[in-house]
Each structure stands twice: as C-alpha cells, then as structure tokens.
Amino acid sequence: MEKNLYSMKGKVCLITGGSTGLGSYIAHGFLAAGASRVYITARSKDNLVKKKNELEKISDGECIAIKSDLSSLDGVNKLVSEIRAREQHIDVLVNNAGIGLGTPIKTMKVEDWDRTMELNTKSPIFLTQALLDMLSKNATLE
C-alpha cells in the first residue's frame, strides 16, 4: 500500500511554470515516479525545450512542453484548448506559474501589479475551473 501511495504510474499531469525552479523539480518527481505524460508550461520556449529534453532522459514517461502566457484569461483559455485537444482527462494539476515584482512600492506601476495579480491569483482559479471536468474523471478520495 505505502509503495503505491507515491506511484504516479500512468498519470497525466499538467504543471504551469514547469520549465524552471520548483515546477521543474515537481515535473522531475512525477516522471521519476512513473507518470506517463507530464505537460510543462512556461513563457520561454527555449527554457521549455531544454527542460523537456532533460526530463525525458530520466524515465519512460513523456514530457510535453507548451509555451503559454497565463497572465491573461486569453492565455489560460489557449492552454485549456491545447490540453483538451490532446487529453481526455488530467490526473494532476499543479498551478505553479507565478511572478514577483521585486519593485519598491514607491516606483511600482499599476500595469505591473495588475499582471502579477492576473498570473498569481486569477489564472490559477480560472485554469482550475476550466479543467474541473477533466480533473474529476479519474478523481479519487486519496
């Protein structure tokens, strides 16, 4: 039982912000644990391709890189369309994409704050909402 608890065998996963940092480590862990397909998304195509090639070497699972900008609802909808065209269900969604301004409050611009809020708070909610039916197909209580 305990061994199966951590198995990702046959799972389909989507990780936003999956090309670097925490998202890339999560993708690595899922593939190492037997996930069949792990989708990683990010804004940088170069980072995505590099990470995809790196991750596919560690397991028999497939890593699929999708360039996407989730800082707008249009970007969220484009990603949802892409996933729906490829999959019937998703087992795991990791809303990891995010940015931090690092700008002193004195010089912060409204546009930068709005973009941060779109990506960090609005996009995860509406991405999850748009994929709920796909997530619930194989949902379990565990």
Model regions: which residues?
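Conserved glycine-rich cofactor-binding loop
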Residues: S19-G21
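The beta1-alpha1 cofactor-binding region of Rossmann-like NAD(H)/NADP(H)-dependent oxidoreductases
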Residues: D46, K67-K78, V110
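Conserved NAD(P)H cofactor-binding loop of Rossmann-fold oxidoreductase domains
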Residues: N96-L101
